[in-house]
Amino acid sequence: MWISPKTDFHEAELDELFWFTETRRTNELGVNAYVMTMISRNPRQIVAFDVDISIKANLIQQMVNSIPPFEKYFSDGGTIYLDVDFFGGHKRNIHNKNDTYTVEGINADLRHYIAGLRRKSRCFFRKLETLKAVLYLFINAYNKFGEAKRVYRERRPNCGRDFGFNHLHYV
């Protein structure tokens, strides 16, 4: 998975999305699927992800171990994070989402841009492998687009915040 060479390994956020696979009927939800994401705050990008039928500490541990260590990790109040060994400090937010706002926003982007993750959608994934493949492709494009925005804004600091596909030649 592509990660920006400008990644600041200071603060990471972790969260998970719940969804289902295999079938979609009004009385049957199929198999649970969880998308676990780890993001860097600067630049705003997904640095690791995994998909499984349940949230498991060993999968989150593999995500943490798969990239260079961050100084601080932030997660929601899920007790599963207590079983993960973080290299830096870990803050578990039990009462609010003040320290997980970035990962919540990125997870909202995943739901928005990937039809199979939308709520009340007619699309769904029949297999976890398909969901993993779609996420891998999307995350690569998402991270590269975010890098293109960063480069564009660096080169044109007074140009405003608007950025679209017509600006991609700046990368």
What are these model-derived regions, one by one?
Residues 1-171:
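Residue-level recognition of single "structural anchor" positions
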